[in-house]
């Protein structure tokens, strides 16, 4: 049997984790022949819930799940971790301003960044899902100076999947026939879902859809999808977020298809004029576990304005937590 992959999950007593952990345990992340060790982290007050989740994981009797560890100590959970899902974050409460939310989560992610720096594998792949994900990832990265910036990412794969599904439904085709969708920027309503490079059955997507539908329906629908789910379901996206997290990490480990890319929040290298070091969603290709930002995509004035809008929001968020960077 192969050497098991150490997978750490924060916020492991939460709803996204509940939709994620069992799929990892049965091979949906690394495939049917790769064993895993699951290392689960949550706050001490969630200890009983976490123990119950561990019991259920045991009861699945998955031959791939070699070991389960439960702890409230980040250093212990991150020790030797090769894949980290950072799901845990403080949700926005009544009367809480964005600055307040950023500050509360900044404290969490700075501490966890230091723990990752001390104990995680030097080749670790870290996915931040807990919101505000882009800036939380930036905080964790800056507090882990001994890890390469490329070890850190944040999730816009859910937005990418939402955009892909919406375009497929509109065009009456299967999602497998959609390629080259891009989500630029922040995981927030300022994100830019871009179809200028997308393909539907190999044809340019914008040649098949009404420009007014693209601007007036497609873009705001993707931007506001999370809020729409909350309004109808009464709770935030959990199963779809877990699925997107699996997709993101699977692509990172196993690579992207030929002639296609995925959307992934990574540290900007200055591509497309985005401020260096900002955690920003770009189209990326992945090979041998390493991502590369897709270069030289033409951007019209409309697209450049949208990129600038979401970049400004991220710069504002960064300024609010600058004392922790």
Swiss-Prot record:
Signal peptide start-end: none
Entry keyword annotation includes NAD: yes
InterPro entries cross-referenced by the UniProt entry: L-lactate/malate_DH, Lactate/malate_DH_C, Lactate/malate_DH_N, Lactate_DH/Glyco_Ohase_4_C, Malate_DH_AS, Malate_DH_type2, NAD(P)-bd_dom_sf
GO MF annotation, one: L-malate dehydrogenase (NAD+) activity
Binding-site positions, substrate: 92, 98, 131, 162
Catalysed reaction, written as an equation: (S)-malate + NAD(+) = oxaloacetate + NADH + H(+)
EC class name: oxidoreductase
Residues annotated as transmembrane: none
UniProt-annotated binding residues for NAD(+): 11-17, 105, 112, 129-131
UniProt keyword terms in alphabetical order: NAD, Oxidoreductase, Tricarboxylic acid cycle
Residue positions of the active site: 187 (proton acceptor)
EC number(s) reported in the record: 1.1.1.37
Biological processes annotated in GO: malate metabolic process; tricarboxylic acid cycle
Listed CDD domains: MDH_chloroplast-like (cd01338)
Protein purpose: Catalyzes the reversible oxidation of malate to oxaloacetate.
Family: Belongs to the LDH/MDH superfamily. MDH type 2 family.
NCBIfam families tied to this protein: MalateDH-SF1, PRK05442.1
Protein name stated in the entry: Malate dehydrogenase
Gene this protein is translated from: mdh
């Amino acid at each position: 049997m192969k050497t098991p992959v150490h997978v750490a999950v924060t916020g492991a007593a939460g709803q996204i984790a509940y939709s994620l952990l069992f799929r990892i345990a049965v091979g949906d992340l690394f495939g049917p022949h790769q064993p895993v060790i699951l290392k689960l982290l949550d706050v001490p007050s969630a200890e009983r819930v976490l123990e119950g989740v561990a019991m259920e994981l045991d009861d699945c009797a998955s031959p791939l799940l070699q070991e389960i560890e439960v702890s409230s100590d980040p250093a212990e959970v991150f020790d030797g971790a090769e894949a980290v899902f950072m799901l845990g974050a403080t949700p926005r409460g009544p009367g809480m301003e964005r600055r307040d939310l950023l500050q509360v989560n900044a404290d969490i992610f700075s501490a966890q960044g230091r723990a990752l720096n001390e104990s995680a594998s030097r080749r670790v792949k870290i996915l931040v899902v807990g919101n505000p994900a882009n800036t939380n990832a930036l905080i964790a990265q800056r507090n882990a100076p001994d890890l390469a910036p490329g070890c850190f990412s944040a999730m816009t794969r859910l937005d990418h999947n939402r955009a892909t599904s919406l375009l497929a439904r509109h065009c009456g085709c299967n999602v497998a026939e959609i390629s080259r969708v891009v989500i630029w920027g922040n995981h927030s309503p300022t994100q830019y879902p871009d179809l200028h490079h997308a393909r539907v059955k190999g044809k340019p997507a914008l040649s098949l859809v009404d420009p007014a539908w693209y601007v007036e329906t497609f873009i705001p629908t993707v931007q506001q999808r999370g809020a729409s789910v909350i309004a109808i379901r009464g709770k935030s996206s959990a199963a779809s977020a877990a699925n997107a997290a699996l997709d993101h990490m699977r692509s990172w480990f196993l690579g992207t298809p030929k002639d296609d890319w995925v959307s992934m929040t990574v540290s900007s290298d200055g591509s497309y004029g985005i401020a260096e070091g900002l955690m920003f969603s770009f189209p990326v290709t992945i090979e041998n576990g390493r991502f590369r930002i897709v270069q030289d995509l033409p951007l019209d004035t409309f697209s450049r304005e949208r990129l600038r809008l979401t970049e400004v929001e991220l710069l504002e968020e960064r300024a609010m937590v600058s004392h922790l960077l």
